[in-house]
């Protein structure tokens, strides 16, 4: 209704100033005008604006709290602006925006979160009140858009002056026609309409023209290239933007508008472009026809030798450059005589100003950072670098290397340039083509032939430097050896451990690995690489590049060894390093015959004690060095000249490991892949989790180690008959018979466990290290190391595996198989390791004395018939044939088998655990058809995560990455889709809001239920990004009770104008945005704010220290999320002198610091601590490492003279530990200089080690008070928690365990290195709305029931949630179940129905069978505990079986010789 009233008002209103029109001019003091009669609470009020003339204002819509009549229903308050709030979420109280002229960025805000304020300095930006920090946050409009407060949106600047910040307008005496209307300027005493090109750079109208007299501009104004007077405030801008602009015409001459900033047109003469530029853009630079200077030759430019400036700008000037020097006479100016006359008609000095277009008589006439020099404004201080200009210039070639010509001055370059892969250029002249492809090398200098001779006037191109008049190319620091660009973070590196994962350190830069090879060690040994360049660290500050012959000696260089890494047989070195005999990890230039790097060094070929396993042999490599290489029976003498190709098993493929470039154990590989013994990886598995898992079992048989096996083809009974005797296969060779047969038969009463030494080690080289002990990613827990003593490698029948299993996994080279499998050499297939089992329900009968005598007689008879054969026994050793229940082998006993799972006998696919007892079963089971089956309160349903596109996930993400064609979503890999938002306005602007009765405000039309500009149908944020949905109100309907309604959004989104949820793209606590976090981490100097890396700066501009769990060290306080030095104050009596504020430590000695007022030097040492005092000072001097402090009322005062007390500098507040110190700082610079890896602590003048992010080195992990308790599945092999307060989440709840590479399981988030539920990661008091799946909703649904891209609307909750939400049922009065089909009762009752195995969970109590200790919730999924195994969707307690390696056991020794094990 309000919109209709406003629309009628606008239609009736005429152009006269007396008729009130929204946005029209008015006289201040005019009475308010009621809108729609007296029954409404809206009226028009005349208020002043930034650009209103004196005594004038603009009509603005206002609202008054009017009581609704009793007979007429109240009309809900609506926003009269074009962007309307959806009617369903309209607040009960009016929401009229009022302008706050005092709003400033990063200051406290106390207005409605949905009202935006104009930025006082940048018309193309606006301020928004952040809901979390309650501070103003700066946002940016789209390109070529300006913010309009009245409309609360970014619009195309039709009347730009109304949107500009307030400027100082001259009085009538300075400008006779200052009363010209908007959009016009005074010229020759007349008001002339101006075009867009005549406006100032900030969009404001010029004050006057300066066509004939350049000095006619009033004070505080300057003459632009368009010959108009613009205010000096139009040149003010933030760091990083020289001049704010909207279109090219608003920039000074010679500049273009790029991203709302005026930038200089640069002449690129070398094959280098800005980072991320395209190769095509670089190629166009060399096309003469398309030269940006219209084919102007460099030789035609006037040359002038550099000259020094006589005056240097004062330190107080702020660097804000505005215009770029344009080389004069680039084009023929004879045809444009007006421009020539305008440039030089005033005086001879005006022509010499060149492209600056600014004449002056004093420094006040010039912009900031400029000085008046010979009648022209010249640059005095370079921008960003804050360095004084030393040389003037007119072209790029007048400046030195790493400088560019900027406003007529040579300034250091601050834009990082990247070298594009060089190409051979063909130079043409008179149809004669000459190609220069040969390199000219003089000594160690590779000559850059583009410049014949270099000097101060003729400089070398980029990436080259002048040496004795010759341009020598610099080493390729920015480009890696594999052709990829170096990483920008970190800036420098000394070792590869300083670089992120999947990268290494080259020439002080971190270089990423290629996908097909990790580093130079993976290259073929046979490849000929005669010369390589390596870096040799000769000091802490300089590096030299030295040419080394790759085929030279292999002696260990101490510079290649890790200084802090120690190694032994139990603690191996990182990949690509070899453990030396001295216990250091060194990088050697040798490789094993299979191409891998040796694990350890050894002494001689006959001594293998230093090798990590029996599969490694000490081998002589390159006739000089002994090292342990994996190759059974290998004897190599001499140098290695070829590489043996390492292949995965037939039919398998290689994938990248979870971290690093090569694997050592299978835990380094993503499941279900395994690592073969040659350092490569292979799959070869028949199925993956999507085709064979606990929640999706094989159609026939069982799922073992990730592949489907048959369980009924060749198997006999499910349980092995313990009374059946086994005999040796007569077809076996006689060489397999042991010498202890007779001894064993005579001493059959004594039982012993089998020993590995009884088995020929040469028959199976993989008999050991199936389950090696090691840290996460390199081994298994210690309690699993004895599986080799329990499991047996049973041989099959020559056709299939033992126990009736079918396998299609072919053994790899060297008879290798994944952990838990062994290679059946008869069929060359990988078969499962088995347990010898007997059923406790059918135990082996005790043999009486008569039965024992009969048994001995049978054995003696068999021994007489076959004197050399083994006695009949049930042994855990391999049987020569596998006949099962129908074996055709004569005299061959059934080999050990595993239990065959029976067919499903319970409803829902479950399995029976036994028969009922008088119609009753144990807790958690019910009697169905005389069988005990798992019982459920509701129909079980396995929850399978669906991707945003609706498809199923293919597996979990590995370090946030997925295979090609898949993307990581919620820590699972989903197929990549190209979906678009169906709600897109044609012009790409943001929708103003929802339509009300199918109508919108002026300038907007209703399209698809939304108000869009013109015929727009999109929902976009002010920065151009897509909105995910509408803001969620804190209450709706009668639940509000007259309370002010607030709006909020999900994590990572904020509620903006129009009540829509937009992504957060700024730092909530202030600071500049660097980019998104990498594995939850940020580089040094930046802090994590949300999911962004923000600059960690203190209020004084200094870089703060990162806090630890929100706590700072002594002497520091938490400010803007970082630790900043606390304020220092002291009296004049204890201060040591005035603080200059310049030089090292502000001019104060070590142990002192400038106070908060920058007046006195106050002590920062703990001088009151007697342990820090060493004694009185002698003549004001103290020993090295101590500082004198004149403590008031000191007992050392004699005759009124205070000699001073010497205080230890180690007592300085905030100083690092002594173990992290390296010495004193070099005080030559203000910040102090320290060796690489150390930072100067200026208050004490001591160098402390720098805190940087680095990879965890093996063997150097933090020492814990006790060994971790490993009790989770192997692929989640991490300690569950370390205990103490550190294991708690932010809300006090216990974490699920530590994060791995910043990642957690499905349904969890990484918080301070701990995996916590998403709800525990939200600030206290923040409203949250939960989706049926438990995820936090990102926003509310749009009025038409839709959401943004990647989300779907849950109509019953009116929330935008991730796709694949389970169906929900509303809770009715009296219904205490709150039932939904996914057993998720968060929105219903407090009762909790058990969830099946494989379903998502948050607590152990949610899983079925948890009360009996059979299940647990791990990584957000219900899993069986170690004492149980999975049957369908439930857990069944493992049975206890007796394991007998010798069936001939006397009854008296049964209790001592049997052992129990759970399977």
Swiss-Prot record:
Residues 94-164 form the Chitin-binding type-2 domain. Disulfide bonds join 141-154. One of its GO terms (cellular component) is extracellular region. Keywords: Chitin-binding, Disulfide bond, Signal. Pfam families: CC (PF04942). SUPFAM superfamilies: Invertebrate chitin-binding proteins. Transmembrane segments: none annotated. The keyword Nuclease does not apply. Residues 722-734 have a biased composition (Polar residues). The keyword Magnesium does not apply. Residues 70-99, 720-773, 841-869 are annotated as: Disordered. Residues 1-17 form the signal peptide. Residues 740-756, 843-853 have a biased composition (Basic residues). GO terms for molecular function: chitin binding. SMART domains: ChtBD2 (SM00494), WR1 (SM00289). This is Chitin binding domain (ChtBD2) containing chtb-1.
């Amino acid at each position: 209704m309000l919109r209709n009233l406003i629309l009628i008002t606008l239609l009736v209103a005429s152009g006269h100033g007396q008729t009130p029109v929204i946005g029209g001019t008015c006289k201040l003091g005019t009475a308010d005008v009621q809108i729609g009669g007296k029954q409404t609470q809206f009226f028009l009020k005349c208020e002043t604006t930034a650009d209103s003339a004196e005594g004038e204002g603009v009509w603005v819509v206002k609202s008054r709290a009017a009581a609704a009549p009793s007979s007429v229903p109240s009309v809900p308050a609506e926003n009269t602006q074009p962007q309307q709030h959806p009617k369903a979420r309209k607040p009960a109280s009016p929401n009229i925006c009022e302008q706050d002229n005092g709003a400033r960025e990063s200051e406290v805000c106390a207005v409605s979160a949905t009202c935006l304020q104009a930025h006082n300095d940048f018309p193309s930006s606006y301020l928004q009140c952040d809901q979390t920090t309650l501070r103003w946050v700066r946002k940016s409009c789209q390109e070529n858009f300006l913010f309009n407060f009245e409309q609360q949106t970014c619009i195309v600047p039709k009347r730009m002056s109304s949107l500009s910040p307030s400027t100082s307008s001259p009085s009538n005496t300075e400008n006779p026609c200052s009363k010209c209307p908007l959009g016009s300027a005074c010229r020759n005493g007349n008001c002339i309409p101006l075009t867009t090109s005549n406006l100032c750079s900030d969009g404001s109208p010029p004050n006057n023209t300066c066509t004939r007299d350049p000095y006619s501009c009033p004070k505080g104004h300057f003459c632009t290239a368009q010959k108009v007077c613009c205010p000096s405030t139009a040149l003010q801008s933030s760091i990083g933007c020289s001049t704010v602009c909207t279109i090219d015409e608003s920039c000074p001459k010679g500049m273009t508008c790029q991203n709302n900033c005026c930038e200089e047109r640069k002449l690129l003469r070398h094959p280098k472009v800005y980072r991320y530029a395209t190769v095509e853009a670089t190629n166009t630079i060399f096309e003469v026809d398309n030269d940006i200077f219209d084919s102007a030759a460099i030789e035609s430019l006037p040359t002038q030798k550099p000259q020094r400036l006589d005056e240097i700008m004062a330190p107080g000037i702020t660097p804000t450059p505005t215009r770029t020097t344009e080389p004069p006479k680039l084009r023929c100016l004879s045809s444009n005589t007006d421009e020539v006359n305008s440039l030089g008609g005033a005086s001879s000095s005006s022509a010499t100003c060149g492209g600056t277009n600014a004449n002056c008589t004093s420094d006040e006439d010039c912009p900031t950072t400029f000085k008046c020099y010979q009648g022209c404004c010249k640059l005095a201080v370079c921008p960003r670098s804050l360095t004084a200009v030393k040389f003037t210039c007119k072209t790029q070639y007048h400046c030195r290397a790493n400088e560019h010509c900027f406003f007529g001055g040579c300034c250091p370059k601050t834009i990082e340039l990247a070298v594009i892969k060089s190409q051979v250029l063909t130079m043409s002249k008179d149809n004669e083509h000459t190609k220069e492809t040969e390199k000219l090398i003089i000594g160690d200098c590779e000559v850059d032939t583009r410049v014949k001779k270099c000097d101060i006037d003729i400089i070398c191109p980029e990436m080259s430097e002048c040496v004795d008049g010759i341009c020598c190319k610099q080493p390729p620091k920015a480009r890696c050896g594999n052709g990829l660009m170096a990483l920008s973070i970190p800036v420098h590196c000394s070792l590869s451990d300083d670089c992120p994962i999947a990268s290494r350190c080259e020439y002080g830069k971190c270089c990423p690995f290629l996908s097909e090879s990790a580093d130079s060690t993976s290259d073929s040994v046979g490849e000929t690489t005669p010369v390589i360049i390596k870096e040799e660290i000769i000091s802490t500050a300089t590096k030299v590049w030295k040419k080394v012959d790759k085929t030279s000696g292999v002696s260990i260089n101490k510079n290649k060894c890790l200084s802090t890494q120690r190694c032994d047989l139990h603690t191996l070195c990182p990949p690509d390093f070899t453990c030396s005999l001295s216990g250091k990890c060194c990088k050697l230039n040798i490789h094993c015959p299979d191409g891998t790097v040796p694990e350890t060094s050894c002494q001689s070929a006959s001594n293998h004690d230093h090798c990590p396993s029996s599969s490694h042999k000490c081998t002589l490599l390159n006739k000089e060095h002994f090292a342990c290489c994996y190759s059974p029976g290998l004897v190599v003498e001499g140098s290695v000249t070829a590489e043996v190709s390492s292949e995965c098993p037939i039919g398998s493929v290689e994938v990248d490991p979870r971290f690093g470039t090569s694997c050592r154990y299978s835990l380094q590989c993503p499941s279900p892949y395994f690592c073969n013994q040659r350092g490569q990886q292979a799959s070869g598995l028949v199925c993956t989790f999507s085709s064979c898992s606990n929640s999706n079992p094989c159609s026939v048989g069982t799922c073992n180690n990730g592949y489907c096996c048959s369980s009924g083809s060749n198997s006999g009974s499910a349980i092995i008959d313990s009374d059946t005797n086994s005999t040796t296969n007569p077809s076996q060779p006689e060489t397999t018979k042991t010498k202890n047969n007779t001894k064993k038969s005579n001493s059959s009463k004594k039982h012993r466990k089998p020993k590995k030494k009884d088995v020929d080690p040469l028959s199976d080289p993989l008999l050991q290290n199936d389950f090696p002990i090691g840290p996460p990613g390199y081994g298994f827990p210690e309690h699993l190391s004895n599986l080799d003593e329990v499991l047996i490698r049973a041989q099959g029948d020559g056709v299939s595996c033992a126990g009736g299993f079918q396998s299609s996994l072919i053994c790899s080279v060297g008879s290798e198989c994944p952990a838990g499998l062994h290679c059946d050499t008869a069929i060359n297939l990988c078969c499962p390791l088995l347990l010898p089992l007997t059923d406790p329900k059918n135990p082996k009968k005790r043999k009486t004395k008569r039965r024992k005598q009969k048994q001995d007689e049978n054995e003696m008879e068999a021994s007489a018939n076959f004197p050399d054969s083994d006695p009949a026994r049930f042994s855990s050793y391999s049987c020569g044939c596998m006949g099962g229940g129908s074996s055709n082998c004569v005299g061959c006993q059934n080999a050990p088998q595993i239990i065959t799972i029976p067919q499903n006998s319970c409803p829902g696919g479950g399995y029976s655990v036994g028969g009922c007892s008088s119609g009753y079963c144990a807790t958690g089971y019910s009697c169905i058809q005389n069988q005990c089956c798992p019982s459920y309160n509701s129909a079980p349903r396995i929850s399978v995560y669906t991707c945003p596109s609706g498809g199923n996930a293919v597996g979990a993400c590995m370090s946030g990455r997925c295979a090609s064609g898949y993307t990581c979503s919620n820590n699972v890999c989903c197929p990549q889709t190209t979906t678009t938002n169906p709600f897109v306005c044609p012009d790409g602007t943001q929708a103003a809001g929802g339509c009300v009765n199918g109508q919108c405000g002026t300038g907007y039309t209703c399209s698809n239920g939304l108000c869009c500009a013109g015929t727009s149908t999109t929902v976009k944020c002010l920065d151009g990004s897509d909105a995910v949905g509408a803001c969620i109100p804190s209450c709706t309907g009668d639940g509000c009770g007259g309370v002010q309604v607030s709006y909020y959004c999900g994590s990572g989104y904020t509620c903006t104008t129009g009540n829509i949820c937009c992504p957060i793209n700024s730092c909530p606590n202030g600071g500049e945005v660097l980019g998104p976090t990498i594995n939850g981490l940020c580089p040094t100097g930046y802090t994590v704010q949300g999911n962004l890396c923000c600059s960690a700066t203190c209020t004084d501009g200094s870089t703060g220290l990162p806090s630890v769990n929100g706590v700072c060290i002594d002497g520091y306080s938490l400010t803007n999320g970082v630790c900043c030095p606390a304020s220092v104050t002291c009296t004049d009596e204890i201060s040591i002198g005035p603080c200059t504020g310049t030089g090292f430590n502000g001019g104060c000695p070590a142990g002192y610091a400038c106070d908060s007022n920058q007046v006195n030097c106050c002590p920062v040492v703990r001088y009151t601590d007697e342990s820090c005092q060493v004694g009185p000072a002698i003549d004001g001097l103290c020993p090295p490492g101590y500082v004198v402090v004149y403590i008031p009322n000191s007992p050392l005062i004699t005759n009124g003279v205070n000699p001073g007390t010497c205080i230890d500098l180690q007592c300085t507040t905030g100083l690092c530990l002594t173990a992290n110190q390296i010495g004193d700082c070099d005080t030559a610079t203000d910040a102090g200089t320290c060796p690489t890896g150390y930072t100067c602590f200026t208050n004490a003048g001591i160098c402390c080690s720098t805190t940087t992010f680095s990879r965890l080195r093996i063997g150097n992990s933090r020492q814990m008070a006790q060994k971790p308790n490993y009790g989770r599945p192997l692929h989640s092999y991490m300690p569950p928690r370390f205990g103490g307060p550190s294991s708690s989440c932010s809300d006090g709840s216990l974490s699920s365990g530590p994060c791995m590479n910043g990642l957690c399981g499905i349904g969890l988030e990484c918080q301070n290195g701990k995996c916590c539920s998403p709800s525990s990661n939200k600030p206290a008091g923040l409203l949250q709305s939960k989706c049926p799946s438990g995820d936090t909703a990102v926003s509310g649904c749009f009025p038409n029931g839709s959401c943004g891209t990647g989300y779907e609307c849950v109509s019953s909750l009116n929330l935008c949630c991730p796709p694949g939400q389970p169906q929900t049922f509303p809770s009715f009065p009296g219904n205490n179940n709150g039932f939904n089909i996914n057993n998720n009762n968060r929105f219903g009752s407090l009762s909790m129905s058990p969830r099946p195995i494989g379903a998502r969970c948050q607590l152990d109590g949610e899983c079925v069978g948890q009360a009996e200790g059979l299940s647990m919730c791990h990584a957000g999924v219900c899993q069986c505990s170690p004492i149980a195994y999975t049957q369908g969707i439930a857990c069944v307690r493992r049975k206890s079986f007796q394991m007998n390696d010798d069936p001939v056991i006397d009854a008296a020794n049964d209790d001592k010789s049997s052992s129990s094990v759970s399977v």
